[in-house]
Amino acid sequence: MTRFWKAFAIFVLFTASTAFAVAEERWQTLPEPAAMPKADQSGYAPVNGFQMYYAVFGAGDPVLLIHGGLGHADVWASQVATLSKTHKVIVADSRGHGRSTRTEQPYGYDLMASDYLALLDYLKVDKTALIGWSDGGIIGIDIALHHPERLTRLFAQAANVTTDGVDPGVITNKTFAAYIDRSGRDYKKMSKTPDQYDAFVAQISHMWETEPAWTKEQLGKITTPTAIVAGDHDEAIKREHTEYMASAIPGAKLIILPNASHFAMLQAPDEYSQAALGFIDAK
């Protein structure tokens, strides 16, 4: 994604100091996350050399929710409230994100997938459904490719499988600029290294320049039941790329969420939760 990063950073500087205009359409908004329910269990798991923040809610068949790049687990608050009524819901902050610490090891999706697998081991969860947004969906695809025995179903929203799946128009999109600005503020509030946001972004950006890079042949080997999901106004991922992913993964279901964008879980929380539940609970 960050072959556009320098230009996008300049755009953010021009827009962050102005109030985010009231949007005419839901898909142009960036709602604040709801309040996260009280966790049944939370803490820090020693994972791959860093401390990974996690929280667990409810009981039942497990569901792992993985957030997107530069974000944190609290974006899932609405989904946690709904899914935890019938499932054991696990959320976490990816390495370097939110409350989790990070190492100097270069970021990569294989590495981040291994972090989540280690967290599942720590929580003694052998197999889980996975709901992933953006980078979280990419991590889910990585696990489906390399460790399908750990997944029951995969709901991957706003993910890409090659770098050219990113829409270059994202660099001038106000909603996405507002997200980057909010992410910086959240990082300073939540991180154990609040003064290192620029270094963190640089590390993530380096990964985005070259990853992911999966071929159609690789995607064709995925056996996990998969839903490829997108808002009908996604700012960051090209629609044709989303459709390509759904056609390349055997048996994948394509789900398009109406009047929603890259941030569908915030814009349409109820519809998002019901779409996810309908897929992960399907027999």
Question: Can you say where each PLM-predicted feature lies in the sequence?
Answer:
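Acidic catalytic loop of the alpha/beta-hydrolase fold
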Residues: 233-237
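Catalytic active-site module of serine/aspartate enzymes centered on a nucleophile-bearing elbow/loop
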Residues: 258-283
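Active-site nucleophile elbow and catalytic-triad environment of alpha/beta-hydrolase enzymes
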Residues: 202-218
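Active-site loop/oxyanion-hole signature of alpha/beta-hydrolase fold enzymes
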Residues: 57, 91-131
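Short beta-strand/loop motif that positions the catalytic acidic residue
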Residues: 222, 228-230
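Conserved HGGG/HGGXW glycine-rich cap/lid loop of the alpha/beta-hydrolase fold
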Residues: 50-99
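Flexible "cap/lid" loop of the alpha/beta hydrolase fold
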Residues: 138-146, 152-185
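Alpha/beta-hydrolase fold catalytic core
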Residues: 2-6, 11-14, 21-61, 86, ...
